[in-house]
């Protein structure tokens, strides 16, 4: 899956999970600071990403995923 395809899928999941507009979801967008996610939202988002991409994101890795771009990079690395 290309980086662009991963970004589009992540963007779709983020807009649905956080009830934000797709235009607000950019690679540099912070889940908490820019998109208004709280800690529960973040956990639910990680679970949705795991399910959508059929991957497992350990807690240690999830703590380092703070932006949309971080999520895309992590998923890209897991699929490589």
UniProtKB/Swiss-Prot annotation:
Annotated GO biological process: lipid A biosynthetic process
InterPro entries named among the record's database cross-references: ACP (IPR003231), ACP-like_sf (IPR036736), PP-bd_ACP (IPR009081), Ppantetheine_attach_site (IPR006162)
Taxonomy, superkingdom: Bacteria
Described purpose of this protein according to its UniProt entry: Carrier of the growing fatty acid chain in fatty acid biosynthesis.
Gene: acpP
Name under which the protein is recorded: Acyl carrier protein
GO CC annotation terms, alphabetical: cytosol; membrane
Post-translational modification: 4'-phosphopantetheine is transferred from CoA to a specific serine of apo-ACP by AcpS. This modification is essential for activity because fatty acids are bound in thioester linkage to the sulfhydryl of the prosthetic group.
